[in-house]
Amino acid sequence: MNQRANQRVAYYNGNIVAERDVRIPFRDRSFLYGDGCFDMTRTFNGTVFKLTEHVERLFESLAYLRIDINLSPSEVVEISNEVLSRNRHLLDAGDDYWLGQRISRGVKAVGDEGWDDTGPTVIVVCEPLTFQERAHYYRDGLKVIIPSVRRTPPEMLSPRTKTHNYLNLVMADL
């Protein structure tokens, strides 16, 4: 594992913890059903881009999914800035981060197996932008196709909601 990756921290359900220590229970509804949403922004020269607007969009997704995370948008902005601040020293000059918030409905207990309802899972992370890995697309171009299977129609699920269901994009990469 990259030494810097080993040092990154994330916000996880109320605490700033080592990123490597974040664990999602297998009964988390996002893992089971894709029942969650996210938003991402990035930094430019270390400065986060339109964080408030991205968090507002996150809260629109949360409202659509009827998930209450018991945090205000301003608190999520503050948490996001804290995560970025604690990870900024790990970047080389000229490098930047993705800064993202990932929310799920959390664990929903079923039956008597000993699991408790957890409430929402809230994670805020920084991930290095990997321009070097994508540079060849800009230099050489890439082939594209129009798939025969389309995304979920907007009558079924609002395309304005950034949900955890990106399986169609995963399939396109295979």
Where are these regions (language model features)?
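Conserved alpha/beta cores of soluble small-molecule-handling proteins
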Residues: 1-174
